[in-house]
């Protein structure tokens, strides 16, 4: 499907215009500044152990939305300014997300090891909301290979998490981040629209984002993904290349394009923004599962390449890697089932 090339001059009465985009970006920039203030206030741990993590998630969430708006509606903005701001937002969002990603990956792999061993799962390393106490069955110890694999993964990912934490602290105190915060503060009060963009229609830009998503989905092997247990995700499982699987790339790209499409729908159209499509939300959830499983499989494979590990440890890591690739396959199947579903109009 050929992408649409919107014309800023095209607009019709009653449709969302560049003025609505300016209000949307200003609101998202204000959310970014509010999250930044919250992150600074919770940095001393006064709000609990999970306070800084919640603030970092809020900061990343607002950064993603500002960045998505600058990308989708770039033609209505100062292009050089939009590109520079997007690059800086991507930097800060990626830097802040590394620590959480390492912790979540470790939790995922340890839970999978215990599940594959038929034992009681270990407690998560990521803080969870308090729940009522439950009676758990007695823990069964892991086998030697699984226990050593768990210890190896814990060492590697805990070290990576510590480095990511230090990197985030360094980034937040850097002149580069302060310059970005100043730029977002200006955006909260004055959105740099292109000349004549205040009255331009946003519809063609949002439609172009949807077209990019549709084209990327059409290139996916959805027919294969729609067959359970097709084992496509396990292809090249013994490749000596430690890099992520090339077959995962198009799925990751669809995940990003789906997020851009969902965020574009949040920009007010007329009186109010449309309600979130549950089909898009479910598809995004499936692609998040795909990303998490693919990255966990890479972590298991990299750990298995550690020099001088015992055969039992390497075997446990190999089983763990295959398990996560099966999770990749299951996520692709879930996405295919969700995407092929059509919303039935209400009667």
Regions of interest found by a model, annotated:
Residues 1-347:
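Cationic, histidine-enriched alpha-helical/coil surfaces that engage anionic ligands
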